[in-house]
Curated annotation (Swiss-Prot):
Protein's organism: Variola virus
Induction description: Expressed in the early phase of the viral replicative cycle.
Disulfide pattern: 32-43, 44-57, 47-65, 68-83, 86-100, 90-108
Compartments where found: Secreted
GO biological process, one term: positive regulation of membrane protein ectodomain proteolysis
UniProt function note: Inhibits host immune defense by binding to host TNF and various chemokines in the extracellular space. Binds host CC chemokines (beta chemokines) and CXC chemokines (alpha chemokines).
Glycan attachment residues as annotated in the record: 101, 173, 189, 215, 248
SMART domains on file: TNFR
One MF term in the entry's GO annotations: tumor necrosis factor receptor activity
Leader peptide range in chain numbering: 1-22
Region (Chemokine-binding): 161-349
Name of the protein this chain belongs to: Cytokine response-modifying protein B
Length: 349
């Protein structure tokens, strides 16, 4: 049985490679069939895909066809003198969607994040990077050539990535995208401020009299501003985040404050909350006061979902001594006054 099958395959191969036994003929109506070509007014057999005409027909012998070699192809009936070369390997910003074989050319298309600037018969000839939507913008569609269309995130949605793929996402529940910390202290001298620093996981305000340090862990909103100003021996300071990242509800944003007086006082106390209007947002705080230089301290911490319809907030406060008015003067930085970011809640403006 195997020998019979082998002979049958060999017979078919002979038909393809040798162009059958039929001789070229003169067409009665002057037209050749679709699988034929005309040469010297004779209709001759074309070579099938995957082969080429190693010898054209004459009056007695039909076309002789030879298989294409590696890296070459023919994709249709032909009487070409040689097979066509496949396209080269795909570029680094492309993916191969069809490999080179004897009947098909290699096809390369653009990788994710790219779009085709120049289309060819065998895939894309030139891929370029898609536009990346900035923070606060999401992908809303694509142009006719495949570039990204960016649109601002509407109310109730947000985006905190720079991406050519991410869309605006619904604002998550029971979380926050903004943290505002206000610290008011008395008494402090007019010349006490020396510098402010931001160091990533630890924000600090240093003065000749005291140091305010805030350590934070697992907080997705990123702290980006701080200030310190003094008026009539009442100092006002604050720390603020941006609004482009939401807190991961599986993690607890933990803030640890230390207000340390730069004297030899040995007192040390951990403050308890004076006010706790917090709800379902995931956060935790501790406040430590070291030294004896301050008689009164107010600390307000506000967690906000600025995209929520009802402007969701959690407010935490701590107090030592008298109630201090932290709304009576414009915040500044080392005696250089500057306005607070427009995104600050009205409670602290």
């Amino acid at each position: 049985m195997k020998s019979v099958l082998y002979l049958y395959i060999l017979f078919l191969s002979c038909i393809i490679i040798n162009g059958r036994d039929a001789a070229p003929y003169t067409p009665p109506n002057g037209k050749c069939k679709d699988t034929e070509y005309k040469r010297h007014n004779l209709c001759c057999l074309s070579c099938p895909p995957g082969t080429y005409a190693s010898r054209l027909c004459d009056s007695k012998t039909n076309t002789q066809c030879t298989p294409c070699g590696s890296g070459t192809f023919t994709s249709r009936n032909n009487h070409l003198p040689a097979c066509l070369s496949c396209n080269g390997r795909c570029n680094s910003n492309q993916v191969e969607t069809r490999s080179c074989n004897t009947t098909h050319n290699r096809i390369c298309e653009c990788s994710p994040g790219y779009y085709c600037l120049l289309k060819g018969s065998s895939g894309c000839k030139a891929c370029v990077s898609q536009t990346k939507c900035g923070i606060g913008y999401g992908v809303s569609g694509h142009t006719s050539v495949g570039d990204v269309i960016c649109s601002p995130c509407g109310f109730g949605t947000y985006s905190h990535t720079v991406s050519s793929a991410d869309k605006c996402e619904p604002v998550p529940n029971n979380t926050f995208n903004y943290i505002d910390v206000e610290i008011t202290l008395y008494p402090v001298n007019d010349t006490s401020c020396t510098r402010t620093t931001t160091t990533g996981l630890s924000e600090s305000i240093l003065t000749s009299e005291l140091t305010i340090t805030m350590n934070h862990t697992d907080c997705n909103p990123v702290f980006r501003e701080e200030y310190f100003s003094v008026l009539n021996k009442v100092a006002t300071s604050g720390f603020f985040t941006g609004e482009n990242r939401y807190q991961n509800i599986s993690k607890v944003c933990t803030l640890n404050f230390e207000i340390k007086c730069n004297n030899k006082g040995s007192s040390f106390k951990q403050l308890t909350k004076a006010k706790n209007d917090d709800g379902m947002m995931s956060h935790s705080e501790t406040v430590t006061l070291a030294g004896d230089c301050l008689s009164s301290v107010d600390i307000y911490i506000l967690y906000s979902n600025t995209n929520a319809q009802d402007y969701e907030t959690d407010t935490i406060s701590y107090r030592v001594g008298n109630v201090l008015d932290d709304d009576s003067h414009m915040p500044g930085s080392c005696n250089i006054h500057k306005p607070i970011t427009n995104s600050k809640p009205t409670r602290f403006l």
